[in-house]
Amino acid sequence: MSIEIRNVSKNFNAFKALDDINLDIQSGELVALLGPSGCGKTTLLRIIAGLETPDAGNIVFHGEDVSQHDVRDRNVGFVFQHYALFRHMTVFDNVAFGLRMKPKGERPGESAIKAKVHELLNMVQLDWLADRYPEQLSGGQRQRIALARALAVEPKILLLDEPFGALDAKVRKELRRWLARLHEEINLTSVFVTHDQEEAMEVADRIVVMNKGVIEQIGSPGEVYENPASDFVYHFLGDSNRLQLGNDQHLLFRPHEVSLSRSAVAEHRAAEVRDIRPLGAITRVTLKVDGQDELIEAEVVKDHDSLAGLARGETLYFKPKAFQPVANL
């Protein structure tokens, strides 16, 4: 099921949440709407679902304009950040709920419902919890049950609003890898909202970077990371450094794109070591460059030659190995 978003705008009083948004999502794609709080990504997701009405523009599902269709008529599955499971129902009954609420003429028999629910619980690898209640589950398990419930009614489109935002970092990482594998199996057109660039990079086929109600860039994870369309995209997609030059330009580069040396070598610039922070397999070194207020961060492997006996206040020499020149505004 393809999705076309045509010239969609939305205001909340004087606040412009979306400004003339255009986006095509292909059938079977997993697309991330990525951006900071207030950028319009959740509003756009809610408009796709039919939970919000745009002030202008159209939403088209597979050639059919659904802009005036009620949310119940759009056949979308929705997974929220906070699970929204029924506390008084077992896992089985939560997943079966949507099937049992279908109109009588469309409702499958109880044996068919049972088979469908167990199929979905097996798919999310939690069939062994069918008789448990939500309060007996971990956060990650609850979110997988919420996803199974959304899939039970066989939606044409799956929408996920920060689905892993309420979980701890380790569980989030496990679940997003699981979601990427699951999407390959079910091949269902899916759109998910996130402010976590690592999550978007790991899960999505394409990323839509949003800021202040507009789309800054659309592309594959590799495209938006390696060829950012704007200063905003570059900074939002990962840690970054800014090195001022003397010709009304500055360089942008990532902490892992820095060469370090204890001695002065060609094209390397002197800087004072302000902090040395071991981070497991890597070490982050914070540097102060004469003539600019912004600090420079470099990340190197923990046994890098430049780190041996290094202390705060000493001089290191650094050079960006890859960078983007940008004109000062």
From Swiss-Prot:
Top-level lineage group: Bacteria
Keywords linked to the UniProt accession: ATP-binding, Cell inner membrane, Cell membrane, Membrane, Nucleotide-binding, Sulfate transport, Translocase, Transport
UniProt cross-references to SUPFAM superfamilies, sorted A to Z: MOP-like (SSF50331), P-loop containing nucleoside triphosphate hydrolases (SSF52540)
SMART domains named in the record: AAA (SM00382)
Binding of ATP, residues: 35-42
Top EC class, one word: translocase
Pfam families: ABC_tran, TOBE_3
Gene Ontology cellular-component terms listed: ATP-binding cassette (ABC) transporter complex
EC number, UniProt record: 7.3.2.3
All residue ranges annotated as the ABC transporter domain in the record: 3-237
Record-level Gene Ontology MF annotations: ABC-type sulfate transporter activity; ABC-type thiosulfate transporter activity; ATP binding; ATP hydrolysis activity
Main localisation: membrane
Catalysis: reaction(s): sulfate(out) + ATP + H2O = sulfate(in) + ADP + phosphate + H(+); thiosulfate(out) + ATP + H2O = thiosulfate(in) + ADP + phosphate + H(+)
Keyword RNA-binding attributed: no
SS bonds (residue pairs): none
Cellular localization per UniProt: Cell inner membrane
Cross-referenced InterPro entries: AAA+_ATPase (IPR003593), ABC_SmlMolc_Importer (IPR050093), ABC_transporter-like_ATP-bd (IPR003439), ABC_transporter-like_CS (IPR017871), Mo/tungstate-bd_C_term_dom (IPR008995), P-loop_NTPase (IPR027417), Sulph_transpt1 (IPR005666), TOBE-like (IPR024765)
GO biological process, one term: sulfate transmembrane transport
Topology versus the membrane: Peripheral membrane protein
Described function: Part of the ABC transporter complex CysAWTP involved in sulfate/thiosulfate import. Responsible for energy coupling to the transport system.
Subunit (UniProt): The complex is composed of two ATP-binding proteins (CysA), two transmembrane proteins (CysT and CysW) and a solute-binding protein (CysP).
Family: Belongs to the ABC transporter superfamily. Sulfate/tungstate importer (TC 3.A.1.6) family.
Protein name: Sulfate/thiosulfate import ATP-binding protein CysA
Organism: Pseudomonas aeruginosa (strain ATCC 15692 / DSM 22644 / CIP 104116 / JCM 14847 / LMG 12228 / 1C / PRS 101 / PAO1)
Upper taxonomic lineage: Bacteria, Pseudomonadati, Pseudomonadota, Gammaproteobacteria, Pseudomonadales
The encoding gene: cysA
